[in-house]
Amino acid sequence: MSSDVLVTTPAQRQTEPHAEAVSRNRRQQATFRKVLAAAMATLREKSYADLTVRLVAARAKVAPATAYTYFSSKNHLIAEVYLDLVRQVPCVTDVNVPMPIRVTSSLRHLALVVADEPEIGAACTAALLDGGADPAVRAVRDRIGAEIHRRITSAIGPGADPGTVFALEMAFFGALVQAGSGTFTYHEIADRLGYVVGLILAGANEPSTGGSE
């Protein structure tokens, strides 16, 4: 008997388009990653001002139109580079480590993602600040904020106080702006963040003085 499939079952009809979609998504993801890697390599050689999506596309060996399919602008591309770096930072959740140390360690790791490549850090800061009017950049900023929020709440643990988390987020992003502008190095802000984290967490643990006398 021939092994050729002459009739496609309903299950096969449902599976085959799904398989095509999965394959297509994998190809798209591979292209996305390739352009991101090319952007990182280009930023090591070119300044923020000199980088263009076309230049990165040429390095990634993809058509400019393909690169623009994934990244609407230079700022969008660089913002995605920073988001990718943030996502590589592990969550610090070891319950055997005191909570303040977990939080400090988490923010320190996040602060140092571009510490050894200040030109990339400066480009990321410029893209995130200058691209505020770009909806694609705003969306990436929101995702970066969500990643930072998740790591802070994970480090604090169950029942993290929203006000404390917000204060830590504000301290972290303020520190990044100072490093990106060159006021401090990334290593310096990482050290200073440890002190600020201590103050915020100590204040959060102080008993409230409110209430009637």
UniProtKB/Swiss-Prot annotation:
Q: Does the keyword Acyltransferase apply?
A: no
One annotated GO molecular function: transcription cis-regulatory region binding
PROSITE patterns reported for this sequence: HTH_TETR_1 (PS01081), HTH_TETR_2 (PS50977)
Q: Where is this region: Disordered?
A: 1-26
The record ties this protein, via Pfam families, to:
TetR_N (PF00440)
Spell out the protein name for this chain.
Uncharacterized HTH-type transcriptional regulator Rv0767c
Specify the HTH tetR-type domain's residue ranges: 29-89
Q: Which organism is it from?
A: Mycobacterium tuberculosis (strain ATCC 25618 / H37Rv)
Matching InterPro entries, A to Z? Answer: DNA-bd_HTH_TetR-type_CS (IPR023772), Homeodomain-like_sf (IPR009057), HTH-type_TetR-like_transc_reg (IPR050109), HTH_TetR (IPR001647)
Coiled-coil intervals in this record?
Answer: none
Q: Please, which domain of life does this record's source organism belong to?
A: Bacteria
What GO biological process terms are annotated to this protein in UniProt? regulation of DNA-templated transcription
Print the keywords alphabetically: DNA-binding, Repeat, Transcription, Transcription regulation
